[in-house]
Each structure stands twice: as C-alpha cells, then as structure tokens.
C-alpha cells in the first residue's frame, strides 16, 4: 500500500510540475506563484494549520476578475491529471510480488467456489453463456468534459504507461516526459467547457465515441478472459454466439422532461448508430482482409467463393461492399427518407455468417491460431453490438400519454380519458387493443404535444426490431399506464411485440409496484401480448429525493421482493431494470456489491441497469478499465443468480421498517416541512446557477416550484458541489441513532455482518460521509447565506456530524474508511486541489449574485469550470 501511495504521489507530482511549466510559459512566474501559494495554503489547512487556511482564503479573495478563470482552470486541470494518475495506478502498477487486482481474479475465483458448492461444469458453462446483462448508457449534465480533452487525457495515460518501465535510459525517459509536457500543454490551451448546451444528438455521439474508443476493444478482451476462466474451471468454452453483456442507450430516446428530444431526433440517432456500427465493422473487415491472405479453405467456403486464390479475402470483400452500402445509405438517410437498397444489411445473420464461415474454415484447415485472433474479436463484437451498436430505449412521462389519450377520446366524443376511473380506462384500452380497426381517422389533427407523442410512436413502429430496447414510462402508477402506450404503439402501426416498461420511482409508487404488475398479469388481454419476461424499472433517484435514501432503499428492496413473488406465482419471468445514478443519493456505488445485495431471486440470469454519463467515462472510458468493470458485472450477476443471498430474518425486516419510518420522518422534517429549507438550499448551493449553465440537453426543472419540481440530478449535484452531500445521508442519522437508543445495536451489527443489502447500504453511507466536509459547507454558508438562515446550515452540519459518529460506532472504527487506506489516500490527494476550487466557487457565486454577468463572461465561465472540476474531483459523488 505504501508503495502504491508513493508511486501515485510521484505521478501526480510529475503531472503537476509539467502543468506548472505550461502555466508559467503562458501566464508568467508571478501567476504560477499565486497558484502555488493557494495550493500550499490548502495543503496546510488540511493539516489543521489555521495560518494555512487563512492564507488560502486571503489568496482567493485577492484574485482579480481576470484571474478567476485561469485559477479555476489550473485546479480543474490538476484534478483531471490526478484522476488520470489514479486510474493508471489502479490498472497497471503491480509487480510480480503483488496479487492480481480483485477485478481480474473475481471470475476465476467465483467459478472455483461454484464448483465447490456442487454446480457441475455443464451447468456453469450453460449459465454463464446465457446471462443477459444490459448496460444502458444515459446522458448526464455533469459530464461536461469535451471529447477532444478526453482523448488527450487518454494519451497522457498511455505516456504514463510508457514511463513505467524500469529499463528506460535517460534519453528515453526524457523523450516520454517531453511528450507528456506537450500533451498537457495541448490540454491547457484547449477550452475545456462547452459554451453552448449540447443537443441530444451531441450526447448520443458522445456515447458512440465511448464505444468506438473503448468498449469496441474491451468487449473481445473481457470475453477472451471469461472464456479462459471458464475453460480452466470446467474444460468447456464460451460459445461463439454468447454475449452475456450488451449495451442499450437513452441518448436520443429519453424525452422525459426534455422537449429537445423529438421524434425527428430519435430517428436521426437510430440512423447515426447504424452508420457508426457499419463504419466500425468496415475498419475491422479491412484489417481482416489484409491479414487473411491464406489459400487453403473448407468446402463450405469454396462453395461460396469458387476457386479464388484468396478465398477469405473474396468472402470478406463481399461483406465489405455490403457494409459500405449500409453506411452510405444510413448517411444519405439523415437528410431524406430513402428506401434501403438490397445490399444494405438488415439482419445480424448477414453480418455474422460470412465471419463464421471464415472462422470455421480456418479451424477446419488447421489454422485455429489465426482464427482465434482478430477474426474472433470481430465475431464477438458482431454478436454483442449487432448492426445497430446499441438498442435505443424510448422514455416518456405517463402524464404525456394520459394527455394524448384524453385529446383522442375527447375528439371521438367518448368523454375525457383523464377523468375516467382506472377500471373504465382498462376496459376501454383492452377493447381497442383487440379491435382491428384504427382508433383514429386519418384526418385527425392533434395539438402539438399529442402530435409529438404519436410521431414518436410512428418512429418506433418503423424502426428495425433489433435497433430498439424498451419503451419506458416514467412516473407510472397504474396498469392503464402500460396499456395506453401499447394502444398508442398499435395505432402507430407497430405489429411486433415491444417491451413496455413501467418505471416506479416515488415512495408511494414503489409500494404500489406489486399490485400494479399483479393487476396487469391478471388481464388475459395483456398476458397474450407479453412475449418474453415482464420488465419493470425501479427508480432510485426520485424515490431518494422524495423520501431520503433510508426509506427509499428499503422500499426498492421490498418492491423487488414483491415483484419476484408475483411473477413466480403467475409463472412469468421477471426482468428488473435498475435506474441507478452515479451518486449514492441516486442509488449509485460499486456495481459488484450492489448486485450482490439485491433480494434473492431478483437476479435470475438477467440484469439491466443505467450507466450515467459522468460514470461512463470513469468506468468505461479506457479499454482496460472497461474490461475490469465488465468482469465485475459478469461475475456479480453470475454469483447473484447461482448463489443468491438468504432472505432477511423477520427481526431485520422489523428493524428496517422502523428505520425507514424514522428516516423518512427525519428527512421530510428538514426537506418538506421546514419552511426555510428551500430558500436556504437556493442560497447555500449553486442550484440556481446550475440551471443557467450549459450542462446537458435537458432542462434542470420539470416545472416551477420547490424541491419537488427539481430533477433528481441537479438536486444531488448542487449539494455535492458544497460537500454537504445532504441527499445521500439525511435520515440515516436519525434511523441509526434511534435504533441504538432502543438498545438494538446487536441487531444492527448482526445485519451488517450477515445481510448484504444492509452492509452495502452502510458501506455506501460511510464512503459518502468520508467525502462530505462540514468545513467546506460552512464556508459556502458564510459567504452566501443570509444571517437569518445561518442557523439552518449549522443544524444540518450537526446532523452530518451525528451521521458520522453513528457510522463510526457501528463499524467500530476511529476514522471513516480506516479499513480502506487506498480510498482515503485518493480522497486526501484530491482535497489539496478541491479545497481551492470550493473556496473559489463560493467567491464566484458571491460575485455573480451581486452583479449582472453575461453567460460568456469570465465570471460565469470560471463558475462553470469550478463546477466541472469539483465533479471530476468527487467522481461517484459528483
């Protein structure tokens, strides 16, 4: 551990020194001295020096308006460079004396354990190859880093790897350092922040870039290692057409609260995905054609290509022509609707079969070593990504469907749908679903909102089946919400099954999820249309905002248990879709632990979850890191399927019921019932300013109003910027303290020891409390909050202190995260660069609120840079 610390600090020191050189060259030595004084003041302040803290504060206060932006940029760049060093450290810095990282050994060790538990080799191979894990990439307003910069950061990581060789001579070391200096200078002189809000298409292109630069390479690598682990444990191989992990996307499909995502945008994103897939396969096939110059071929391949002297190249040439035709058609279709020529690839078999033919021929002719190289990689990609790269989900709020149905029934003279009771709605919807005639006449001219809903349904109906995932209904609360979407899709001409997925996201809706699904599955007209599993989405963000994470986590657990029970009774398979955020307050945290903490039976070989924008870069932005995270998902879902945790004991349930009640009471007493809270929130955090900044294509609010009108992301994000982290812990301090006051400490210890659900909750709570910082939060209050509201901030900081103390008591530690010195080291390293950014942000907010400033003024740009830097520094709580 000490060796890792020393090496990490060595890398950070080097990168910081090179950044300093760049800053000195542009701004002069005097300006660099200011930066260094601020950094040293922050470092001394962290060590408890009052003089250091005063020096830091005075240095920031003394900055002129023209210095605010470059100072903010300097510390933002420091944090991004520290992230690069940390990611590299976690991935590569291990010599032969150190054990393999957990992510690399988790699957082999699990397979050995499963064999010991009595699972046969055949059963293990069968289960691993039929796993269905889908990671759904979503846009996220806190992912503000530009793709241009991300590529430069990746190049810096590559140079750190090049430097990490003991046999380098001084000339080689100097050359690598020079390349690092150039890359850091390029990053410094590149504007890191978008000045205009990205469009949904921009966000989708960002997602495609992650696939192109990282996942495209990681997929065959992780599958090769999974195949090796399976063979070592069982003697069996992973089938060629196994794709345990696939990808879907919400970028360009999620229109909930985002008027910028229209039917036209969704069609464009579907075509862009098709173009991108064809382009990536073309690159692969070009490389394969260059490599596969062999003459010997199987009879099956000869039957296809005749007596060609280069049979593999001949077969690949045909595929290349079809891929080119597909790419050209998709590109042309972006500007006008065109029929697809015959050469365009329509079915994944048309892509797979030529590759399989070449693969099998090489094996038959004794050239397996060639087949198992890049050709196998291309095959694995073709199975995983298909012709459409990702499956696009569509998401819309239930109220939009209700409004559309109301306009339709009103027009038809049937009354107002929104005023009908639930049973009347169900009867009407089932009747129309079974009716062969259209519901609407061709001359119906709906209002703009209804027209957009219907246009979206028409895009869905026209799109190829394999290009789409699920139609998700946010704020679902009844069976009719699902049936209404089915009817709207039928009316648009959809003639194939499509998963229509209710998303239950408030506390009340989570409690009602079981009864709603039970009602749906009890309708013969619905069951006859259900092909495959019943998919249900569990919302983590809004339930936590509604009730606090204590009550929300328990409601999510109980809802899943109930859904498992109902689907088992109804003999229907269940697919749970987890709408987790990157932050703890939105259900985030390490995926491996989260999956293993799900209720028994809820992960039965299937798992679907969102991956949020800011976490996509950290978990999947580099091929090696993506590979590790794919390994973790694969192992966790396999373990949760074959070794599910036992159900909680009755006494634990009783305890959680009481803690949830105490937690929601304490949370709502602050957030909902204190009349001063909303005003304090708006003064103490950058919430108002975040709404003005170009952070993502979606508006920050659903509508005007208080906390309930905020989307979950800015709600969490605002508290994270000030380090109070309130949404992630508020309620737990009361729930745990009251349990201890009742003398139930032994039961709590037992729950933490024996129940993965509770242990994971406490671990996540401890992690977020370690990143929270009362002193930083107080600093914002002192500069931004009016005197009459200061007492509320002090009260919240007292509650934070209470939460820290009760968690320390529960874990038996003297310091949060004492059991994880590596994580503590990473937090400590970042604080030196975060502290000045927090102080700077508070000063920027103070200056911004006292004067009018245009969105492109240095003041506003510096504020945006500070937001991005703090998000980068805090990562999974950013």
Curated annotation (Swiss-Prot):
Signal sequence extent: none
Claim: Hydrolase is one of the keywords in the record: no
SUPFAM superfamilies cross-referenced by the UniProt entry: Phosphoenolpyruvate/pyruvate domain
Reactions accelerated catalytically: oxaloacetate + phosphate = phosphoenolpyruvate + hydrogencarbonate
Gene Ontology terms describing biological process: carbon fixation; oxaloacetate metabolic process; tricarboxylic acid cycle
Intrachain disulfide bonds: none
Keyword terms, alphabetized: Carbon dioxide fixation, Lyase, Magnesium
Example of a GO cellular component annotation carried by this entry: cytosol
Function: Forms oxaloacetate, a four-carbon dicarboxylic acid source for the tricarboxylic acid cycle.
Protein name (record): Phosphoenolpyruvate carboxylase
UniProt source species: Pseudomonas savastanoi pv. phaseolicola (strain 1448A / Race 6)
Taxonomic lineage from the root: Bacteria, Pseudomonadati, Pseudomonadota, Gammaproteobacteria, Pseudomonadales
